[in-house]
Each structure stands twice: as structure tokens, then as C-alpha cells.
């Protein structure tokens, strides 16, 4: 499951994000991170903060807590793992509304995948914390280097 998550997440930046940008006729809005361009101390500070607040914090809230609750809520629904994963992904995407429509869609898709992986893996949070941290590290570095 961790390998599948890694492969899919690895495709987000080069394939999925541009496709969603084209389909929504928008681009994810990272304008609030403009000061990172060429600013290594700021980028490294944000990476450290992202590992604590997003990788660990968001995975605890959105996977360990929310997915547990949603899975229980859909207890009588056939295919509840899918409903819980999609609902969790929707909530996760909407929590990233500051990124615009494209950002909501991509983040929601990743959130649904992470929720599904969490439930299917016997609720193993650590591979998702690692994946989330790597995604955020890559994102900060692309902003620092001016690639996005």
C-alpha cells in the first residue's frame, strides 16, 4: 500500500496537477508563498514547520481521527471504505480552499487516496506522515526554486 501511495503521489506534480489545472481552467494558487523564492532560510523553516503541522498534524486530524469517525458513520453502508475515503478527501480538499479550485481538487484526490490507504493498511499512519512530509517538502522546494 505504501508503494502504491508513493507511486500515485509521485505522479501528482508532473501529471495530475497539470491535468486538473487544464480541466478546471485554473491553476493552484500558491501566491502567498512568494517570499520563498530564493530564500533558503525561509524555505527550510517552512519545511520544518510543514513536517510538524501538516505531515504529523493533518494526518492525525484527517486520517487518524476523521477517517475513523467516517468509517464508523458509514458502518451500515456497503462499500463504506469508499464513501469514507471520498468524504474525507472532500473535507481535506475544502480545507485547502486557499489554493483555489485546482488546489482543492488535487488536494481532495490525494486526501481520498490517503484515507483509503489508511483504512486498507490497518490504519498505519506512519507511511502517510512520511508521504505527506515528502509532498510538502517537494512543494516548498519547487516554490523556493521558482519551478511553480
Where are these regions (language model features)?
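Membrane-interface helix caps and helix-loop-helix hairpins in membrane proteins
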Residues: 94-102
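Functionally important transmembrane alpha-helices
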Residues: 101-148
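Membrane-interface helix/loop boundary segments of multi-pass membrane proteins
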Residues: 57-86, 116-123
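Hydrophobic, membrane-inserted alpha-helices
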Residues: 47, 85-95, 110-114
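Hydrophobic alpha-helical transmembrane segments
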Residues: 3, 44-48, 82-87, 104-105, ...
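Aromatic-enriched alpha-helical transmembrane segments of multi-pass intramembrane proteins
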Residues: 36-41, 78-87, 123, 138, ...
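Juxtamembrane helix-loop-helix connectors linking adjacent transmembrane helices
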Residues: 1-54, 72-77
Amino acid at each position: 500500500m505504501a508503494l502504491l501511495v508513493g507511486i500515485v503521489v509521485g505522479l501528482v506534480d508532473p501529471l495530475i496537477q497539470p491535468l486538473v489545472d487544464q480541466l478546471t481552467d485554473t491553476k493552484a494558487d500558491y501566491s502567498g508563498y512568494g517570499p520563498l523564492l530564493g530564500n533558503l532560510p525561509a524555505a527550510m523553516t517552512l519545511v520544518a514547520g510543514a513536517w510538524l503541522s501538516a505531515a504529523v498534524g493533518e494526518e492525525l486530524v484527517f486520517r487518524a481521527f476523521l477517517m475513523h469517525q467516517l468509517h464508523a458513520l458509514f458502518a451500515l453502508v456497503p462499500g463504506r471504505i469508499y464513501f469514507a475515503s471520498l468524504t474525507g478527501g472532500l473535507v481535506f480538499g475544502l480545507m485547502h480552499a486557499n489554493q483555489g479550485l485546482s488546489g482543492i481538487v488535487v488536494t481532495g484526490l490525494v486526501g481520498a487516496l490517503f484515507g483509503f490507504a489508511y483504512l486498507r493498511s490497518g490504519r498505519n499512519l506512519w507511511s502517510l506522515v512520511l508521504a505527506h512530509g515528502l509532498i510538502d517538502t517537494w512543494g516548498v522546494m519547487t516554490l523556493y526554486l521558482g519551478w511553480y
